[in-house]
Regions:
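Alpha-carbonic anhydrase
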Residues: 4, 18-259
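Residue-level signal for mature regions of secreted extracellular proteins and peptides
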Residues: 11-12, 39
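Sec-dependent signal peptide recognition
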Residues: 2-8
Length: 259
């Protein structure tokens, strides 16, 4: 495995998704911004139905006015070679207890002890990972069957970095079974089981949270090689949340890099 790209740590536990970061506020989100228009008081009311993505600017203005929003459509033919200042290093080979909950927006897994990744020489600690019934990002317009978002945060700067693992229909995933069977409980999980065999190739760009408050300056890493999940597993997650994905946003002046 290439250490310059992606690997998972001896202190890490489990990963998570990225849009939802109720347990961390990015450094650049001031209290004024977060509370504007009653954001903090009303954030719990956003959803994917009557208060869905087209109304999220009512909960956080950034969702409607931000110029660097996520998710986006990745067009491989329009990407640039990776700036290696942003190479990602994860350290695998860990297992530990993690709590699994239905938080009203997705199925979320939170490790008892945080893991970490290294990004441009800085450490980002694992906060949680969660699932979307379909991928939020698309590649050449294609939406994957499922996605896991692994959310990490720099403890000093509070900047966020999210690793996205796509899933396609195929062989059953052991780690997904563990998650499905233990919602509302704690269970021992190994984060290495969530990663594809080829975790050394990915897309990178700077975007945002994919849920309110839609805060920007989030480092996104989307693994190119998907994992597989059985038809039954995919259908089970969609029983919880069939449409918990935000529509793709405009790229504007951003560059998508590929490694």
């Amino acid at each position: 495995m290439k250490k310059t790209v992606i690997a998972m740590s001896a202190v890490a536990l489990l990963l998570v998704g990225c849009g939802h970061t109720e347990d961390a506020k990015p450094a650049h989100v001031s209290n004024t911004e977060h509370k504007a228009s009653g954001d903090a008081a009303h954030a719990k009311h956003w959803n994917y139905s009557e208060n869905g993505p087209s109304h999220w600017d009512e909960f956080s203005r950034t969702c409607g006015t931000g110029q660097h929003q996520s998710p986006i459509n990745i067009i491989p033919g329009k990407t640039m070679s990776m700036n290696h200042d942003y190479d990602l290093s994860m350290h695998e080979d860990v297992s530990g207890m993690a709590s699994i909950i239905d938080n009203g927006h997705s199925i979320k897994v939170t490790p008892e002890h945080g893991g970490s990744i290294t990004l441009h020489g800085e450490t980002f600690n694992l906060l949680q990972f969660h699932f979307h019934g379909k991928s939020e990002h698309t590649v050449d317009g294609k939406r994957y069957d499922m996605v896991a978002h692994m959310v990490h945060q720099n403890p000093e700067t509070k900047q966020l970095a999210v690793v996205a693992v796509f899933f396609t229909e195929g062989e059953k995933s052991a780690i997904l079974d563990s998650v499905i069977d233990n919602v509302g409980k704690s269970v021992k999980l190994d984060p290495q089981d969530l990663l594809p065999a080829d975790d050394a190739h990915y897309y990178h760009y700077v975007g945002s949270l994919t849920t309110p408050p839609c805060s920007e300056n989030v480092q996104w890493y989307l693994l190119k090689t998907p994992k597989t999940a059985s038809t039954e597993q995919i259908e089970h997650f969609r029983k919880f949340y069939v449409d918990n994905e935000r529509p793709v946003q405009e790229l504007h002046d951003r560059v998508v890099e590929v490694n």
